[in-house]
């Protein structure tokens, strides 16, 4: 599967003929392990090994591919002494994602009834 994503206007976006920013973001977030990586990095930077363990031993190859994509999208950065962490933009994403997490909790309780 060809690598697609990053900055709108630079590449085609899977599932979109427009390449609008929201479509590019949803394309990136919809890739396997992407949301999990962002979720695990929300608290503190992690080394590759710690991140892999936190991600239920995801394949090192796919984990590295996703980290590269997230770095290209400016959501994650490699910090020399502490491993991978969220950038300022990544932290902004995590902050904006939390209302969806809270909604999912409420939805889960209602769906269980």
Model feature map: region roles:
Residues 1-9, 54-66:
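Membrane-interacting alpha-helical segments
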Residues 2-9, 16-21, 39, 95-113:
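Amphipathic alpha-helical dimerization/coiled-coil segments
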Residues 49-50, 63, 102, 112:
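Short linear functional motifs in flexible/disordered or boundary regions
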């Amino acid at each position: 599967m060809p690598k697609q994503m990053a900055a709108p206007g630079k590449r085609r976006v899977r599932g979109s003929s427009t390449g609008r920013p929201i479509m590019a973001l949803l394309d990136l977030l919809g890739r396997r392990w992407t949301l999990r990586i962002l979720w695990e990095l929300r608290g503190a930077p992690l080394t590759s090994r710690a991140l892999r363990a936190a991600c239920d031993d995801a394949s090192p190859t796919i984990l590295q591919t996703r980290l590269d994509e997230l770095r290209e999208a400016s959501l994650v950065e490699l910090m020399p002494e502490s491993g991978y962490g969220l950038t300022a933009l990544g932290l902004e994403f995590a902050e904006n994602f939390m209302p969806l997490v809270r909604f999912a909790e409420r939805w889960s309780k209602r769906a269980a009834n």
